[in-house]
Structure formats: C-alpha cells, structure tokens
Amino acid sequence: AALVGAWRLRRAGERERALGIGTLGLAELSHLLLLWGAGWWALTALCETVRFVPYGLREHALLLVAAATVASWMLLALRERWRELALLCLALVPVALLALASAWRFDYQPFGEFGWLAWPLLFATHLLSLRRLAPLLPAKALSVAHVLGCWLLLGVLALELRYLFALLAEQYNAWRWLGWALVPSAYLLLVAGGRSLP
C-alpha cells in the first residue's frame, strides 16, 4: 500500500506543487512512503523466507527475491520515469553483500544449492538495471553501484574458486587460497586488455 501511495503522491506532486502536510510537499511524502514501502517489502520477504525456506537455501532464496523485486521496480521506474525508484534499485548490491556476509562460513560454496541460479540472475539484473536506468540516475550513484557490483562479482567468483581448490587440496595447503589470487589477476588482465566491459 505504501508503494502504491508513493506512486500516486509522486504523480499528484507533478501537477500540484502547493499541496502537502506542514513543511513536507507531496514529493517528500512520496519519498517517505517509497522508503517505508520498500522497508516493509524487505522485512516481509526476509521473514517469510526464514519461515518457509530451509536453512541452507535461505540466502540464495533471498537473492532470487531481491533480483525479481529489483527487476520489477526497474520496469516500473522506466515506465514512469521515476528517479527515486531507480535510485532504490541500486540497493541490490548492498543487499547481496549482506546475504553473502550472512552465508559466510569456511565451507560456503556460492554456486552450491540454488546459488548457480541466484548469483548469475542477481548479476544479470544488476547489470541490466545499471544499463537501462542510467538516464534516470545520478552519475556518482551509478559509478558507486558499478564499482560495488564489480567487487561483489570478483568476491563471489573468488569464493567459488577457493571452494573448488579446497576440495582438491589437502588441509593446510596453500593451493586452497589460489582462488583469491586468480580471479583478481584475471580481472586485471581483462581491464588492461583495453576491452570495454559491461
């Protein structure tokens, strides 16, 4: 209801600038309702995931819900030219960082369970939203989201490679940490090659 209220207030605020409550205009009320609705949506998704999804799948299920949510918000922001909702779509990477921190344990495999679906879908949604929402977003926010997404991608790939090397190596062997060196090195080689990356 708060998200719909934010949308209606935003549309009304474009026509009627003088209306509002106290010192808050319709645009500010729309921003507050948008944040309120997004907060409730996130809390509800978290509670229902904890309630219904088995323990080992929770983080990946939350990533799928977050990617689907941002994809739908992206479409709505594009259709309505809604800058605030487009800015809210950039919260996908911080949410993914929280999910990664929540799932962190020594034997965590990012592409295990449903991670093979959740992480690529999340990165595809992130890149698509960065590309499609670029005209609606401030350049600084777009740049920060791009850098955070790049670091998250490198971290997830390094974690997966570390897990695979840990399966091959014996305990107390340095090979298990090779993933942390190979992925950033490969990224630096790609960047140094002069190709334009997404």
Language model regions located:
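Alpha-helical transmembrane segments of multi-pass membrane proteins
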Residues: 1-198
